[in-house]
Amino acid sequence: MSFLKKSLFLVLFLGLVSFSICEEEKRETEEEENEDEMNEESEEKRESPERPPGFTPFRVD
């Protein structure tokens, strides 16, 4: 009986550890994706500065 308790405890403990590691990796992946999205948005803003409607930088006569 004692052997079964120890085995069950070990299995549950290892399962909990592996679950927490998976959750941590998932959280890191989501943070990286959010950082990538923020970088893409900031690059788009830098590439296209805000201009009033109808404004063209070159004048054609």
UniProtKB/Swiss-Prot annotation:
Q: What is this protein called?
A: [Thr6, Val10, Asp11]-phyllokinin
Which residue ranges run through the membrane? none
Instruction: State one molecular function term (GO).
Output: toxin activity
- Chain intervals with Acidic residues compositional bias: 30-42
Which residues are removed as the propeptide when the protein matures?
23-50
Q: In which tissues is it expressed?
A: Expressed by the skin glands.
Instruction: Supply the InterPro entries for this chain.
Output: Frog_antimicrobial_propeptide
Name the job this protein performs.
Answer: Induces relaxation of rat smooth muscle from tail artery and contraction of that from ileum, urinary bladder and uterus. Binds to both bradykinin receptor B1 (BDKRB1) and B2 (BDKRB2).
The signal peptide stretch is: 1-22
Query: Where is the stretch described as Disordered?
Result: 24-61
Keyword list (alphabetical) reads: Cleavage on pair of basic residues, G-protein coupled receptor impairing toxin, Secreted, Signal, Toxin, Vasoactive, Vasodilator
Q: Where is this chain primarily localised? A: secreted
Q: Where in the cell is it found?
A: Secreted
A GO BP entry is: vasodilation
